[in-house]
Swiss-Prot record:
It is an enzyme of class 2 (transferase). The active site is at S116 (charge relay system), D213 (charge relay system), H243 (charge relay system). Pathway: Lipid metabolism; fatty acid reduction for biolumincescence. Its EC number is 2.3.1.-. The lineage of its organism: Bacteria, Pseudomonadati, Pseudomonadota, Gammaproteobacteria, Vibrionales. Keywords: Acyltransferase, Luminescence, Transferase. One of its GO terms (molecular function) is acyltransferase activity, transferring groups other than amino-acyl groups. It holds the Pfam family Acyl_transf_2. GO terms for biological process: bioluminescence; fatty acid metabolic process. It comes from Aliivibrio fischeri. InterPro entries: AB_hydrolase_fold, LuxD. This is Acyl transferase. Acyl transferase is part of the fatty acid reductase system required for aldehyde biosynthesis; it produces fatty acids for the luminescent reaction. Belongs to the LuxD family.
Length: 307
């Protein structure tokens, strides 16, 4: 998979049997630091593309990690499909496809970092796939409650026939019928369904909440941690943060630092974040962010020409 002579971010395409494709970006560990034991897979939050996590990938690679990101099918980003057809099950299948692809390429030690809505997907699959550890940030545990807060109305109480055509979720039109139908059919919507999915979790797990998060109740995340009944789990709070971890540079840097510390700790089988990290220069983080936006635009233009 790796190509040391490749561009700063290595672009991969997973081609599916139905003609669709999932775009994957690979970031190699920096050459001047010891390479860590695990590959980090980042699952972006809803309405976030993989290039939105350029800074986190830079932090992780600066500290010796091999980093993989992807855009889900039927989501914002470079993979196939439109966001008005997105469902939680499509997000789940996209994640599973990328994990299988990594396994096929000889990557066996995977640590998963999942944010926001993708964390709910991670909780669903964590006991069904081979992971070494899990890190979630502002992870959704009660989907129905989070949707009600984000949309300012509990649309899941309505009959399918009475739903509006689209739900405006963070400026994107989410197809209401297909999304809500999938939620009920596959039991994505309740806290209890999340608790059932993580029951008996054996791998190390660190969860980050944000103390100003109005979309996810910290009490419910604590309930999730307690339900696992394992000493291999730990909860931390990102002080001063809301659900939007990129709302300002101070919050964003704290997120990068905290998650990188968690990854380093878990790479060594620890849960304590009293650990030193190598901080990339601000100019390097800015540069890689700009370069990846350009790469995204170039790929989008190529896709338009092929359409």
């Amino acid at each position: 998979m790796k190509d040391e002579s490749a561009f700063f971010t290595i672009d991969h395409i997973i081609k599916l049997d139905n003609g669709q494709s999932i775009r994957v970006w690979e970031t190699l560990p920096k050459k001047n630091v010891p390479e860590k034991k695990h590959t980090i897979l980042i699952a972006s939050g809803f309405a976030r593309r993989m290039d939105h996590f350029a800074g986190l990938a830079e932090y992780l690679s600066t500290n010796g990690f091999h980093v993989i990101r992807y855009d889900s099918l039927h989501h914002v980003g470079l993979s196939s499909g439109c966001i008005n057809e997105f469902t939680m099950s499509i997000g789940k299948n996209s994640l599973l496809t990328v994990v299988d692809w990594l396994t096929d390429h000889g990557v066996e030690r995977i640590g998963l970092i999942a944010a926001s809505l993708s964390a709910r997907i991670a909780y669903e699959v964590v006991n069904k796939i081979k992971l070494s550890f899990l890190i979630t940030a502002v992870g959704v545990v009660n989907l129905r409650d989070t949707l009600e807060k984000a949309l300012e109305y509990d649309y899941l109480q309505l009959p399918i026939s009475e739903l509006p055509e689209d739900l405006d979720f963070e400026g994107h039109n989410l197809g209401s019928e297909v999304f809500v139908t999938d939620c009920f059919k596959h039991n994505w919507d309740t806290l209890d369904s999340t608790l059932n999915s993580v029951k008996g979790l054996a791998i190390p797990f660190i969860a980050f909440t944000a103390n100003d998060d109005s979309w996810v109740k910290q009490s419910e995340v604590i309930e999730l941690i307690d339900s696992i009944e394992s000493s291999n789990c730990k909860l931390y709070s990102l002080i001063g943060s809301s659900h939007d971890l990129g709302e300002n540079l101070v919050v964003l840097r704290n997120f990068y630092q905290s998650v990188t510390k968690a990854a380093l700790a878990l790479d060594d089988g620890l849960l304590d974040l009293e650990i030193d990290i190598i901080e990339p220069r601000f100019e390097d983080v800015t540069s890689i962010t700009v370069k990846e936006r350009r790469l995204k635009n170039e790929i989008e233009n190529e896709l338009l020409e092929l359409a």
